[in-house]
């Protein structure tokens, strides 16, 4: 369900890379499935002729609003280190994952278990930009050069950092997440009382309500879909 596989207009592959997919469970990757893929890849004597699996990409929350548990993250992290490939976490909606009432994953856990992750800004009130984090000082050589080559290095981009400085002052980032989680919980309660059902159970502000075509058409009259 990773959006880089089906959305982003094929941006990853447009840069010369290949997105390899494995089965999902509740929108998440399972370490066992990733390991099965890696074992199959290396068991093939002709693997040098195939696309090399060079990184594991996950999103927290997932595209379905589900969350990785600490145990799941630790399992994926250990697997990646065993195979010497980086674990990258997409944190576009990270504020809402960290604020979910039942999560046992902290920002410190993510920094400890991943090789790179990013802190979403635009889905948390920022006007522009995301903050890429290399937890152990592992920024790739020539990282900024690569960013510039692909049109991702903005002039005066340091100003984007002001937003994150503000978001991480006085726990504003956490407060935004908690406010959204509480609002989503209230919305979920109201919709359930109205008889609505949900495609997946999500503890975040991503809620997937099941509607029939008539309901969608009625809503579309006032709200573009």
Regions found by a protein language model. Give the residues of each.
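Conserved PLP-anchoring active-site segment centered on the Schiff-base-forming lysine
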Residues: 1-6, 35
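Active-site PLP attachment segment
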Residues: 12, 93, 107-141
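PLP-dependent aminotransferase-class I/II
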Residues: 16-54, 58-61, 68-75
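Catalytic PLP-binding core of fold-type I/II PLP enzymes
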Residues: 68-100
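Conserved core segment of the aminotransferase class I/II
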Residues: 130-154, 165-170
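Structural signature of PLP-dependent enzymes
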Residues: 146-148, 167-188, 203
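Conserved C-terminal alpha-helix-loop-beta "cap" of PLP-dependent enzymes
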Residues: 185-225
């Amino acid at each position: 369900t990773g959006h880089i596989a089906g959305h982003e207009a094929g941006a990853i592959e447009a840069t010369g890379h290949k997105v390899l997919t494995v089965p999902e469970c509740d929108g998440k990757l399972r370490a066992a499935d990733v390991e099965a893929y890696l074992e199959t890849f290396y068991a093939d004597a002709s693997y040098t002729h195939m696309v090399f699996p060079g990184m594991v990409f996950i999103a927290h929350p997932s595209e379905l609003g589900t969350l990785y548990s600490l145990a799941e993250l630790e399992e994926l992290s250990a697997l990646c280190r065993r195979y010497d490939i980086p674990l990258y976490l997409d944190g576009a909606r990270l504020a809402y994952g960290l604020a979910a009432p039942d999560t046992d994953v902290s920002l410190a856990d993510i920094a400890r278990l991943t090789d790179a992750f990013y802190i979403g800004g635009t889905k948390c009130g920022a006007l522009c930009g995301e903050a890429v984090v290399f937890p152990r000082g592992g920024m790739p050589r020539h990282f900024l050069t690569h960013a510039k080559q692909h049109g991702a290095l903005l002039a005066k981009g340091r100003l984007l950092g002001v937003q994150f400085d503000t978001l991480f002052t006085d726990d504003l980032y956490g407060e935004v997440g908690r406010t959204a989680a509480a609002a989503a919980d209230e919305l979920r309660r109201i919709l359930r009382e109205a008889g609505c059902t949900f495609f997946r159970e999500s503890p975040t502000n991503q809620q997937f309500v099941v509607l029939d075509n008539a309901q969608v058409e009625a809503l579309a009259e006032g709200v573009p879909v």
